[in-house]
Amino acid sequence: MASFVDRVVLHVSGGSGGHGCVSVKREKFKPLGGPDGGNGGDGGNVILRVSHQTTTLLDYHHAPHRHASNGGQGMGDWRGGKQGETLILPVPDGTVVKTKDGEVLADLVGEGTEYVAAAGGQGGLGNSSLSSQKRRAPGFALLGVDGEASDIVLELKSIADIALVGFPSAGKSSLIAAMSAARPKIADYPFTTLIPNLGVVEAGEVRFTIADVPGLIEGASEGKGLGHHFLRHVERCTALVHVLDTATLESDRDPLSDLAIIEAELEKYAVDMSYAGVDGEVIPLNERPKLVALNKIDTPDGKDMAEFVRAELEGRGYRVFEVSASSHEGLRQLSFAMAELVTAARARATVVTAKITPPVLRPRAVNRKEFTIRPEERNLEPLFRVLGAKPVRWVKQTDFTNEEAIGYLAERLNKLGVEDGLFKKGAKPGDTVVIGEDGENAVVFDWEPTMMAGAELLSGPRGTDPRFTDLGDRPTRSQKREEYQERRDAKSAARAELESERKAGIWTESVSARRDREAHESREAASTDDGDAL
């Protein structure tokens, strides 16, 4: 099972926003308490954060799907929904975030550096937030919006000061084990090193990190061997050390030919220039400071080979060190030479100041277009597609099972100028209009304008729409007032009729008189029965 993973494809999705609530305040002696529906909670974000406790992307290799929690639903009594919890994903220092197409989204360097990989969805407004002077008691609420979902690629580029490069079995792992406390796997066969190894070296007062990457072979820049896959771990290094094998067992190899092949592969390798760092430049690998370490001089033929090629290498301008990872010969001089390169690189980094761009406040343009209309054709019929962040978001927030919510959407689109734009594009009543790109969130409808050119609104009061007349008529406020007045008039007429009957003597007998009359009649009936019996 793999223990080191430096590239994964991660599927992240933010939490969905909670729906707004439709509720009316109910309290004793307050039959019309007004709307009190709360807003839905926002969905949680997915954030990548650099942590020194994380050294590999192995966890995301086994579990590549990560989803933040959703926002809670709004409730009555003005209670808002719970906010979705933010999902923090720890990543190693030096992680590069890319799209599947290779576009760099972020380069995460430094403890605590963050990047929002997927934002959570916005919670919907409750009917209390939608009320106004004209809309006192909305019978609808806005729906929550789904969170962002995307597939991102995480690539780990190890952060080291010095990189050891060379052919397989050149002794790179032995060197890093001899110079630091790192304990990489060491064996006497090629490609023993399958993952990058990091070690910390101290030379006097200078402390720096060296990286051991898998061996390079001819054609590594084209994907041969393992070197091309791990060369990105060398991109952040300030200097390189060529580790040359002076005791190779292959007859067609020697330190000079090995160096030429490695230099050619480094020159062919294209450094990722999409992130240029603070100074705005990325130095190619073959132009960075280099040292040459002639390794394995403790062998019988190694010392002779090192003395034979040393003059040639120094003539080319290289600083050459004869070292042995087994006997530790020459390692002290090599470590101090590395420290000099690291110190010089750090001094240059401190001299170069970051270009601080002062914040510029740009007010929103007054006449900025919030949408675009694209005429299309489908099945030889005209089609008009409305695109824009606002219209698409409004469609996602609309509950299409509620006629009043659809009317509210129509009002918003009309105020935004969508209807005027359709007129200008030549749209006619009955033409097909699509809001958004084709997909699950797109809305298709036959356009029936609520406003003709220069005419008044043809639609009724708030919440009504001519396109939904077949669904049933909803009484307007004026109709409700008329019905209420008719009921009051009917009650007044009934009272007047009762009053006229009372004045006519129909209702003059009181309750006590009726009781006395009934008691008298019952006594007379009883005496009549007694006389008949005698």
Curated annotation (Swiss-Prot):
GO MF entry, a single one: GTP binding
Binding of GTP, residues: 166-173, 191-195, 212-215, 295-298, 324-326
Domain of life (superkingdom): Bacteria
Gene3D superfamilies in alphabetical order: GTP-binding protein OBG, C-terminal domain, GTP1/OBG domain, P-loop containing nucleotide triphosphate hydrolases
Segments for region (Disordered): 63-82, 456-534
Database matches in InterPro entries: G_OBG, GTP-bd, GTP-bd_Obg/CgtA, GTP-bd_prot_GTP1/OBG_C_sf, GTP1-OBG_CS, GTP1_OBG_dom, GTP1_OBG_dom_sf, OBG_GTPase
Biased composition annotated in UniProt, kind: Gly residues: 71-82
EC number: 3.6.5.-
Start and end residues of each Obg domain: 2-159
GO cellular component: a single term: cytoplasm
Keyword Glycoprotein: no
Names of required cofactors: Mg(2+)
Enzyme superclass (EC): hydrolase
Chain sites annotated for binding Mg(2+): 173, 193
Domain OBG-type G: 160-343
UniProt keyword annotations, A-Z: Cytoplasm, GTP-binding, Hydrolase, Magnesium, Metal-binding, Nucleotide-binding
Subcellular location: Cytoplasm
Domain OCT, residue spans: 363-449
Role summary: An essential GTPase which binds GTP, GDP and possibly (p)ppGpp with moderate affinity, with high nucleotide exchange rates and a fairly low GTP hydrolysis rate. Plays a role in control of the cell cycle, stress response, ribosome biogenesis and in those bacteria that undergo differentiation, in morphogenesis control.
Quaternary structure (record): Monomer.
Family: Belongs to the TRAFAC class OBG-HflX-like GTPase superfamily. OBG GTPase family.
Protein name: GTPase Obg
Source organism per UniProt: Renibacterium salmoninarum (strain ATCC 33209 / DSM 20767 / JCM 11484 / NBRC 15589 / NCIMB 2235)
